[in-house]
Amino acid sequence: MSRFEKLQNHVLIIPSMLVVAVFGILPLAFIVLVSFYQASFEGFIPVFTPSNYSALFGSALTAKVLYTTLRLSAITVALALVLGYPIAYTLAYKVRSPRKQTFVLLMLIIPFLMDYSIRTLSWYPILGAKGFVNIFLQQAGVTSGPLSLLFSESSLIAIWLQTYVLFMITPIYLALVKIDPSGVDAARTLGASSWQAFLSVTLPLSLPGVVVGSIYVLVSTISDYATPELFGGGIQTVGLEIAQRASSFLWPEAAAFAVLLILVFLALSYLVLRFVDIQQLF
């Protein structure tokens, strides 16, 4: 590659680097900066202080909220993987027609074209006291009265699963369609069963998609505040804690909690990416 071509490549990436810097790095840097400021009725006073972090790490509520959020998010990721992997596998290997694959993908994507609040609130007529599930259970004689299905950890996980499972399906599907079928054929030729070929060839090669999907779902659920506020029934999550502090104009405290959240994201991503190379997905 000539010097001119190298210079041309560098010039071409300048606009994208500026976008990342302005809309990504600078806001994060501002959040970190505000997290060291003093809170006031006007939002914050630009006076350096570590008191926000002292209060954050010295509070038992922080550990409780972080544990609850990570536990519920991990359960959601596991369920999304159990549900999403078979769907992605079926779409990649069982649906042969590209037209049918496109149709199925559109059917999965169309609900996400609706407003998030509408999709979330649609769970009320499903899980509510007079919702479809309770009416069905009562008419079937399973229960004598309506069950309290909303405002619980189970309902929160179910709504998260419905909302973010597509984020698990898509990267797994992209990883599966990139797998060379000759590897599976070679395993079968050497005497491996379909299940053994899947475990030894398909699953390891699809791990980048699993990792990317898991990170997507984990980040989305940990940072979500609207769903816990509407359906959590008093369950405190990290995203909800940040939103409540920000709405109360406790911006430095909210920023400190946000920095903690970012550090958790980075730590989890680092641990996972040490063992899986997601560049194979692209």
Task: List the predicted regions and their residue ranges.
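Membrane-helix/interface signature in polytopic inner-membrane proteins
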Residues: 173-185, 193-194
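Membrane-helix boundary and inter-helical linker elements of multi-pass secondary transporters
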Residues: 247-249
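Membrane-water interface segments at the C-terminal ends of transmembrane alpha-helices
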Residues: 5-41, 56, 60-177, 201-223, ...
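Hydrophobic positions on the alpha-helical face of helix-turn-helix-like DNA-binding modules
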Residues: 186-187, 197, 242
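Short cytosolic juxtamembrane segments of multi-pass membrane proteins
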Residues: 275-282
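Short hydrophobic, aromatic-rich alpha-helical segments embedded in or entering the lipid bilayer
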Residues: 44-58, 233-245
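Glycine/proline-centered hinge or cleavage motifs at structural transition points of membrane proteins
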Residues: 190-192, 204
